[in-house]
Structure formats: structure tokens, C-alpha cells
Amino acid sequence: KILLSYIGVVLFLTGCGVYSFTGVAITAETISIKNFYNDADGGPPDMAQTFTNQLTDYFQRNTNLTQVEEKGELQIEGVVTNYRLTPVAPTATGTDDVGDAAALTRLTITVSVSYVNTTDENFSFENKTFSFFEDFDNELNITAIEADLLTRIFDQIILDIFNATVANW
């Protein structure tokens, strides 16, 4: 009876492993993230640098990869290709002489990314597009809320890039 209990405990413990909630099982040890550049019309002048910094910080916080300037086992580079403000959620003004107005404006950011995985080329990709948007009240001044909007949009795009590269989702 003690032997059966011992075998049960051993089987239970061997079933327990170290699991990652991000799904990251990385064999590489180094990563190089080149500075993204801005090819979008509009947006703040430091938008691409801000994106690069947030991306680098995210990989630092969520992996054990050592960041190197170039020739990492994993390599990421890209460009911010689109910064677009679009009116959404039209509302009627109630007068004939004034056209309908938008209650919300949508800020959309698009990034094109190339990724090289030197440990397994099957995971590499070139010029993959990642995009996300945030809507905001049309009454608000974009310059007053732009930094916050960019942070939230970048957070989602970076999560998508992370999942497409090292998390393999």
C-alpha cells in the first residue's frame, strides 16, 4: 500500500512541469532589435523610437533573451507604415445647413515587421503587417491624448509581434 502511494506521488510529480503562461519555449539566447523607422505620414516625430523602446522593454521583461546590437539568434526590424485618423460613429446634427459629424475619431497605427529566427528558419517572416486602433471622443484634442493613445496601440501591436515571434501563436 505504501509502495502504491509512493508510485502515485512520483507519477503526480512527473506530470508537473514548468509551464509558461506566454507559451514561450525559446532555444535562442540572444535577440537584436533594430531601430524601427517612421515611414508614415503624420504622428509625432519620435513615434518610431518610442515604438522601438517599448518593443525592446517588452522582450526584456518577458524573456530571458540577451539583447545584442546585431546578429542575434533572433532578429527583429521594421517600419511604422501608417498613422491614420479616421472619423467613425457619425451623429446627426439635426440641422439641414450643417452636415453630419463624427462622434468618435479612430487612430490607427500599422507596423511592418521582418523577423529572422536563426535557430529555426521555419518561424522567420518578412514584412508582416501588424495594426491596431483606438477610438477617442471627437471633442478631445489629439495632441493632448496622443501619447496615451500611442502607448495603448503600441502595447497591443507589441503583444501581437511577441506572439508571432517567440510565443509562436
Q: Model regions: which residues?
A:
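Compositionally biased, intrinsically disordered linkers/stalks adjacent to structured regions
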Residues: 48, 146-169
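Surface-exposed short loop/turn segments
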Residues: 61-63, 76-124, 132-144
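Second-shell loop/turn segments in exported
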Residues: 38-45, 140-150
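A short coil-to-beta-strand element that immediately follows conserved catalytic motifs
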Residues: 69-75, 125-127
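A structural "domain/chain start" motif
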Residues: 14-60, 64, 69-72, 119, ...
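Sec-dependent bacterial lipoprotein signal peptides
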Residues: 1-16
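Short coil-to-beta-strand
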Residues: 29, 125-130
